[in-house]
Amino acid sequence: MAQYHGTHSIMQSKCFESFAYFQIWLANIEDSRCDGGYLGSSQGPSYEDEYYLLCRRRPSTTTKRRRMSDDCASNELNSSIVACTAFVHVFETMDGRVTVRYCLDHCGHPVEVDDHHRRETKKFENRLTLKRSSPCATYELCDESCDCEQSSSSMASSPSSSVDFEDEDASNNNYKLQESIDAYAVSSLNAIINQRLDSTADRLKTLTKVLQELAVDIRNTDCRMVI
């Protein structure tokens, strides 16, 4: 984390007598941050390499739930997981106890830097496109003998051609804008629906497991009282 963000956060730890108590503690943390769910070990207890990510930015499901032992297909995805400092590292033992090491201070993802670089690159490409669309393609190198200014002024002096070009550009821009808005709205809606479905499924699984734990505790208590 210090390598990516230049700051040092405090690592904390807790120990819980049962998985049910751990789920209650984790639910209280999630209520103040974002939707999420615990990814259990595929090899059972004592498999101590589970990684749980809590992020205020609501990352994708793939980013949020990934075992540290899994091989990442993308180095960029792997770095974004490790560099995010808001996480809960879970250890399960055979006696039913759960130990967690966690840090809830979030400092961002390296991909934010990449996004800024992409935005700057896009701006440069737009400027380059505008420059190429000017009457003189080598505007920076033109001299007094170049007639680019005269050709541009002659185009501006023609009212009919100017109006035609403006109307055509406006109609094309409106069509492209509407098309991009529709595509963005559909993709965003699908992403939100998928995220909500995943979150609801995780919470139902968590609630079911907590209820099972409580039922076992109640049954054991009743048996001891009868004895």
UniProtKB/Swiss-Prot annotation:
It comes from Caenorhabditis elegans. This is Uncharacterized protein K02D10.4.
